[in-house]
């Protein structure tokens, strides 16, 4: 039974409000002793022409209380106490029957959502900052798909621009082929940095680089061949990380894909009378929106990121007819996306309102213990490998006889890192501290994983239990609070979708793990006082494990069955 919906239906019977609006207004009381759901009566003051606290009293008398232990007023609020036995039975039966589908819905059926995320630059390091966009984007993709949306995951690769002209010049002069095959990104970065150092002494190098890129734009065979090689070598390195994270994309259409689509966009902007000359550059003026101009073409005629993003948005709308187009890109790019979306609106594309920028913070290191390949960039692959190594050390200390230690360490280590990136509001910076990230205590990935493994251990020891569970035996505060939390899984998911914030699911699963451990510490399960209590508690454990697994899967994290 969906109690939130039941509350809404009961209120609707006595007011003119619609169920959808009532559900949005319903709150969870700040203290458990105040009830399970609260409805603020302020919204009804105009209709009833009475003070909200008087309206609450009237509704309390009229409302159908079936399914609730009691309904009380707290000032202007109407507070509902659910029937604990009915709730526990409804929630556990629903979880155990729906299993891996529990928490899902068809709310997004028939709606396409484009999610652009990860998007590293070709020939540049895939560093720890990239995991923010990669983890958030992957989680949003999974969460939206779980609720019925048809998602299109796009890795908008940074594979175009004048930097490739520079890289071609650097390659021809200084490349070490052996080093390139051994560590492609490291070698490409080395020669790119060398190019900039040499160009300060010899300005002719910059001219040569521009000429290289011009030839690439014109489709020159030699330059195109080198560009493809840089791209292939980079993707080979990137895919190592994506494989570790278990991430796949539906499209790798990067900046180069839109290179032949930009002239049409520039022409469309010009045809709408929006293109203005500014010191030789072409811009769209956005003064009335309190924004600087959106540059469309530089003074040398070259297009820039905004032009490519405009072309990409128009192409995606034509190709996918999206319900939403989500850009998971760092918060510093917020102004850029406001300019792009506003320009789209000025061009007459009202669907620009369906384009959403999902920003995120920075990653900082708590100490310098994480080694770097070139002194300043921390490669993501190295970070993940180090996390696996550190986790294996912990396993060897705590449970040296554990089977499949390597596999467990991989899942736990990588999962711990991803969990850290998704734990708090995405716009908050992350301070990376191994001691905290890999701790089995506190609000960490390993703590949640350990809670799941603890539950699975109980289920293995319990074996096959026969008979129908009598959920009225689950009468304690800890049992009710855990079951009630399990019933709120879909609410957490819908909040994550509403706010485009995976942390809503992460915070939720932390609370489930905490509630489970409170229950575990307060009550005997396998040594319960009688078989009916034992069976009911085992079912509660089984449902908890299912919800934790479903939640972690939505975050892109694998569970471990034993640790």
From Swiss-Prot:
Keywords associated with the record: Aminoacyl-tRNA synthetase, ATP-binding, Cytoplasm, Ligase, Nucleotide-binding, Protein biosynthesis
UniProt keyword ATP-binding present: yes
GO cellular component, one term: cytoplasm
Residue span of motif 'HIGH' region: 120-130
Family matches, as InterPro entries: aa-tRNA-synth_I_CS (IPR001412), Arg-tRNA-ligase (IPR001278), Arg-tRNA-synth_N (IPR005148), Arg-tRNA-synth_N_sf (IPR036695), ArgRS_core (IPR035684), DALR_anticod-bd (IPR008909), Rossmann-like_a/b/a_fold (IPR014729), tRNAsynth_Ia_anticodon-bd (IPR009080)
Taxonomy, superkingdom: Bacteria
Top-level EC class: ligase
GO terms classed as biological process: arginyl-tRNA aminoacylation
Subcellular location: Cytoplasm
Family classification: Belongs to the class-I aminoacyl-tRNA synthetase family.
Protein name: Arginine--tRNA ligase
Provenance organism: Clostridium botulinum (strain Hall / ATCC 3502 / NCTC 13319 / Type A)
Lineage, highest ranks first: Bacteria, Bacillati, Bacillota, Clostridia, Eubacteriales
């Amino acid at each position: 039974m969906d109690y939130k919906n039941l509350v809404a239906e009961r209120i609707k019977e006595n007011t003119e409000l619609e169920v959808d609006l009532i559900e949005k207004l319903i709150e969870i009381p700040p203290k458990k002793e105040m009830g399970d759901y609260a409805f603020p009566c302020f919204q009804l003051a105009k209709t009833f022409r009475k003070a909200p606290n008087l309206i609450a009293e009237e509704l309390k008398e009229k409302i159908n209380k079936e399914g609730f232990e009691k309904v009380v007023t707290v000032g202007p609020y109407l507070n509902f106490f659910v029937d604990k036995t009915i709730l526990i039975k409804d929630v556990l039966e629903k979880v155990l029957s729906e299993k891996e589908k529990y928490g899902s819905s068809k709310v997004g059926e028939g709606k396409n959502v484009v999610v652009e995320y990860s998007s590293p630059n070709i020939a540049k390091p895939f560093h720890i900052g990239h995991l923010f966009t990669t983890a958030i984007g992957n989680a949003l993709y999974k969460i939206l798909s779980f609720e019925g949306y048809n998602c299109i995951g796009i890795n908008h690769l940074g594979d175009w621009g004048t930097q490739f002209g520079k890289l071609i010049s650097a390659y021809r002069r200084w490349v070490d082929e052996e080093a390139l095959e051994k560590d492609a990104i490291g070698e490409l970065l080395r020669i790119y940095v060398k190019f900039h150092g040499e160009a300060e002494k010899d300005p002719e190098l910059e001219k040569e680089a521009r000429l290289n890129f011009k030839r690439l734009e014109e489709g020159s065979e030699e330059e195109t061949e080198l560009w493809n090689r840089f791209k292939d070598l980079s993707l080979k390195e990137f895919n190592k990380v994506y494989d570790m994270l278990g991430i796949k994309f539906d499209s790798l259409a990067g900046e180069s894909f839109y290179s032949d689509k930009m002239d049409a966009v520039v022409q469309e902007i010009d045809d709408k009378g929006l293109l203005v000359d500014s010191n030789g550059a072409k811009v769209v003026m956005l003064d009335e929106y309190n924004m600087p101009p959106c540059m469309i073409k530089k003074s040398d005629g070259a297009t820039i990121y905004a032009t490519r993003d405009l072309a990409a948005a128009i192409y995606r709308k034509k190709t996918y007819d999206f319900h939403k187009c989500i850009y998971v890109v760092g918060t510093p790019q917020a102004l850029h996306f406001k300019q792009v979306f506003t320009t789209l609106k000025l061009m007459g594309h009202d669907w620009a309102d369906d384009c959403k920028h999902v920003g995120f913070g920075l990653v900082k290191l708590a100490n310098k213990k994480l080694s770097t390949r070139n002194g300043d960039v921390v490669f993501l692959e190295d970070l993940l490998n180090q996390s696996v190594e550190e986790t294996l050390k912990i396993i060897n200390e705590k449970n040296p006889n554990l089977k499949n230690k390597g596999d467990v360490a991989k899942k736990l280590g990588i999962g711990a890192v991803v969990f850290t990136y998704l734990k708090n509001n995405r716009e908050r910076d992350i301070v990376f501290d191994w001691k905290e990230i890999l701790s089995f205590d506190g609000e960490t990935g390993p703590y949640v994983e350990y809670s799941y493994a603890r539950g699975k251990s109980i289920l293995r020891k319990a074996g096959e239990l026969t008979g129908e569970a009598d959920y009225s035996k689950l009468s304690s505060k800890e049992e009710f609070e855990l079951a009630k939390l399990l019933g709120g899984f879909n609410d957490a998911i819908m909040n994550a979708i509403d706010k485009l914030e995976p942390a809503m699911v992460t915070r939720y699963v932390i609370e489930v793990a905490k509630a489970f451990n409170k229950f575990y510490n307060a009550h005997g399960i396998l040594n319960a006082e009688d078989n009916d209590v034992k069976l009911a508690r085992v079912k509660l454990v089984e449902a908890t494990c299912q919800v934790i697994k479903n939640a972690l899967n939505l975050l892109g994290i694998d569970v471990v069955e034993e640790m």
